Design a protein with these regions (language model features):
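C-terminal motif of bacterial Sec signal peptides marking the signal peptidase cleavage site
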Residues: 18-22
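Beta-strand/beta-sandwich contexts
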Residues: 26-67, 115-128
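Short, ordered, surface-exposed loop/turn motifs in non-cytosolic proteins
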Residues: 64-66, 135-158
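Short, acidic Ser/Thr/Gly-rich low-complexity loop/linker segments typical of extracellular
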Residues: 83-85, 158-173
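Conserved catalytic scaffold of divalent metal-dependent phosphoesterases
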Residues: 144, 215-221, 234-237, 325-406, ...
C-alpha cells in the first residue's frame, strides 16, 4: 500500500518571475518531434509550489536530464522546468515558481525538438502523513483555515461518508458521476465561482486510480437568521426579448437585496434556467445563462435545481442528458445546511426514454439510486431538523378548492414518490417546486391523505411568467398561466421558524392580489377583430367569452396568487361593510 501525503489547499497568487522560472520567450516554436520518450501523465498532480514531481516511465523510455519539461496554460503562457533525476523506471521534475494551480498542456523539449504528452491539472497542497485504506479511489480533506473540519458529509452521489477528526474523508468510489461533493455544514460557506457555490469538484482520473479532492470552508456567523431567494423557471433562450425582460427581474432583485442587507442571503433556482430546444437552434446554453446572470447579479450564492429543459434532448439516456448540466452547473442531486435548516436538491425528471429527438419523452420520477443516496444523507440529519427540498416538477397537484392529488396520478410514478414520502416520515418537510408556471401551496392537512406526513408543498411561480410571451406581446406586463405576476419567492428563516412570501417583479412586496369588478369585465369576439383564425386560438379565447359575459351582479373576482387554506381573508366594500366571499376556480 502506498503512503500518501495529507494535503491542505493553498490560496496562491500568480507570480511572474524572471530567469529560469519566467515565461518562455523563444521567438520561434520548437520543431514538433517524436523522440523516444514515454511516461504516464496523470490527469491531476497534487504538489507544492516549486515542488518536485515524479513521473512513471513507460517501457524504459526515460527523458534525459538535459531535456526541459514545459507546462503551458490554455492562453499560451509556458513555464520551463528542469529534470532533476531520471532512470529507466521514473524521473523527477522541479516545478518552476511561476507555475500556479490550473490546467496545463505538458511537453518535453530536447534541443529544437518538442514532444507533446497531453494535459494535466496542478493543485497545490500541504503535506501531512496519511495512508488511505486499500480500495480507496477518492480521498481528501475538508478544511477551514489551517484546520480540518470533522463530521462533514461527503458523497459521490452513490456512497456517503463523513470526515474524521482531522477533516479527512475517503471513498471507494466507482466515479460514475465523475465528481464528489460535500453537504456544506451549518455555520460555514464555500467559495463562489460567479453565483455558483463551489461545493463539488470534478474528478480527473479513472475509477482505478487513487486521487485527491479537497474542499475549503469559510466560517460564518449569524447564519441562524437568513433569507433565501427562490427563482422559478427562467427559460432563457435569447428569443422573445427574454434577455431584456430578465434584466427587469435582476434589477428588481438587486434593488430588494440592496434594501435588505441585514442578515445572510442566498439564492436557489427551481430548474429550467435554459431551454434545451434552443441550445442548438439559438446557441444559448448554460455558459450563456451563466454569463447572463453573473453579469447582473453579484454577492449572492445561488444553488441550482435541474429542470426538464436543462436536459440535452439529443441524448438517449438519463445520464447523458444531464451531462452538460453537471459539467457547467452542479450535481443533479445534493444537500447543504444553512443555519438550522437542511436543504436537499433532487432531480425528478427521468430521461431514460430519450431517443435523441425533440420528442423529449421524460417521466416525472425519482431514480432508485437517488433515493438510496437520500437515505444515506438523512442518516446524518436529526428528525427535529426542518427539511427544505427542491425538485423541478411538482409532487402534488390541485384538484379543486383545497384538495390535492399526487401529481397527475401517474401510476408509474407512485412507487418512487411514495417511497420518497416514506423516507421523509418523521421530518417536517417543505417541498419547493416549479415547472407549472403557476403558484399553489399544499399544507400537511391536505397532503396527509396522500401518504405524506408533515409535508408542505410550495409551487413557487416563475421568473419568465408565460415563457416571456406576455411581456413580449405587451411590454411591461408579465403574467403567468394562473394570472399571477412573474416573480420570485422570499423565504425568511429564524432558527427553525420559516416564513415565505411571493414578490412580483417590478411591484412593491405588498402587492399580493389583483381584484376585478365583474360589472366592468366581459369578453367578446368584437374585442379582438384581428384574432387568429386558428382553431386552437379561437377555442382558447372562447373559454374567456363563456366565462365572462356582460353582467351586473355586483361581484368582485380576487386573484390571491400565494393563497393557502390557513389564511384568513376579509373583504370590505367602500363603506367598510364586510362582504361574504366564496373560493372559486376561474380564468384570469
Amino acid at each position: 500500500m502506498r503512503n500518501y501525503k495529507f494535503i491542505w489547499v493553498l490560496v496562491l497568487s500568480i507570480l511572474m518571475l524572471g530567469g529560469v522560472n519566467s515565461c518562455s520567450s523563444e521567438n520561434s516554436e520548437p520543431e514538433v518531434d517524436t523522440f523516444d520518450v514515454d511516461f504516464v501523465l496523470p490527469a491531476g498532480i497534487d504538489t507544492q509550489k516549486g515542488g518536485i514531481v515524479s513521473f512513471v516511465v513507460r517501457d524504459g523510455k526515460a527523458p534525459e536530464t538535459t531535456d526541459l519539461m514545459y507546462f503551458t496554460t490554455d492562453d499560451g503562457i509556458s513555464r520551463s522546468c528542469t529534470i532533476t533525476e531520471t532512470s529507466s523506471a521514473s524521473f523527477s521534475v522541479k516545478l518552476s515558481n511561476g507555475i500556479v494551480e490550473g490546467d496545463y498542456s505538458v511537453s518535453l523539449k530536447r534541443g529544437s525538438r518538442r514532444k507533446e504528452f497531453g494535459k494535466t491539472h496542478i493543485t497545490f497542497v500541504k503535506q501531512v502523513e496519511f495512508t488511505p485504506d486499500e480500495g480507496t479511489t477518492v480521498w481528501g480533506v475538508v478544511s477551514c483555515g489551517d484546520k480540518g473540519v470533522a463530521n462533514v458529509v461527503v458523497s459521490d452521489g452513490y456512497l456517503t461518508t463523513t470526515t474524521n477528526t482531522d477533516g479527512i474523508y475517503q471513498l471507494k468510489s466507482e466515479k460514475t458521476w465523475g465528481y464528489v461533493f460535500i453537504s456544506i455544514p451549518s455555520g460555514y460557506e464555500v467559495s463562489s465561482k460567479g453565483v455558483l457555490p463551489q461545493f463539488y469538484t470534478t474528478l480527473k482520473s479513472d475509477a482505478k486510480t487513487l486521487e485527491r479532492a479537497d474542499f475549503t470552508l469559510a466560517k460564518v456567523e449569524g447564519q441562524d437568521n437568513f433569507r433565501m431567494y427562490i427563482f422559478g423557471d427562467m427559460h432563457l433562450a435569447n428569443r422573445t426579448n427574454d434577455k431584456a425582460q430578465f434584466k427587469v427581474f435582476t434589477n428588481d432583485l438587486n434593488k430588494y437585496l440592496d434594501s435588505h442587507k441585514s442578515g445572510k442571503s442566498y439564492g436557489l433556482t427551481l430548474g429550467d434556467m435554459t431551454w434545451d430546444l434552443y441550445w442548438y437552434s439559438r446557441g444559448y446554453e448554460f455558459p450563456q445563462y451563466l454569463d447572463e446572470i453573473n453579469s447582473q447579479v453579484s454577492g449572492l450564492q445561488i444553488f441550482h435545481t435541474m429542470g426538464n429543459h436543462d436536459n440535452d434532448f439529443k441524448a438517449k439516456n438519463d445520464f447523458d442528458a444531464a451531462f452538460q448540466y453537471v459539467r457547467d452547473i452542479a450535481p443533479t442531486y445534493y444537500s447543504y445546511n444553512i443555519g438550522q435548516i437542511h436543504f436537499i436538491v433532487l432531480d425528478d425528471i427521468d430521461c431514460s426514454d430519450y431517443d435523441g429527438t425533440e420528442s423529449r419523452n421524460y417521466e416525472k420520477n425519482f431514480t432508485s439510486d437517488q433515493l438510496d443516496w437520500l437515505l444515506q444523507d438523512l442518516s446524518y440529519v436529526d428528525k427535529s431538523t426542518p427539511l427544505v427540498i427542491t425538485t423541478h416538477a411538482q409532487i402534488f397537484y390541485p384538484k379543486g378548492n383545497n384538495s390535492f392529488a399526487l401529481d397527475g396520478q401517474v401510476i408509474e410514478r407512485w412507487p418512487n414518490t411514495k417511497k420518497l414520502l416514506n423516507i421523509l416520515k418523521g421530518y417536517t418537510v417543505h417541498f419547493v417546486t416549479g415547472h407549472t408556471h403557476t403558484i399553489f401551496n399544499a399544507l400537511p392537512s391536505e397532503t396527509a391523505p396522500l401518504g405524506a406526513e408533515n409535508v408542505f408543498e410550495h409551487n413557487a411561480g416563475s421568473i419568465c411568467a408565460s415563457w416571456w410571451w406576455s411581456g413580449y406581446l405587451t411590454p411591461g406586463v408579465y403574467v403567468s398561466l394562473d394570472g399571477a405576476p412573474a416573480g420570485y419567492s422570499i423565504w425568511e428563516f429564524a432558527g427553525k421558524d420559516i416564513k415565505w412570501k411571493y414578490k412580483a417583479v417590478g411591484m412593491d412586496e405588498n402587492y399580493q392580489f389583483r381584484a376585478y369588478d365583474l360589472n366592468n369585465v366581459s369578453f367578446s369576439y368584437s374585442d379582438v377583430p384581428n384574432i387568429s383564425t386558428s382553431t386552437k386560438v379561437q377555442n382558447a379565447f372562447d373559454y374567456y367569452v363563456k366565462a365572462y359575459p356582460k353582467n351586473s351582479n355586483n361581484e368582485v373576482l380576487i386573484n390571491i396568487w400565494n393563497w393557502n387554506s390557513n389564511w384568513k381573508l376579509s373583504v370590505t366594500d367602500e363603506t367598510g361593510k364586510e362582504l361574504k366571499w366564496t373560493q372559486t376556480v376561474a380564468y384570469d
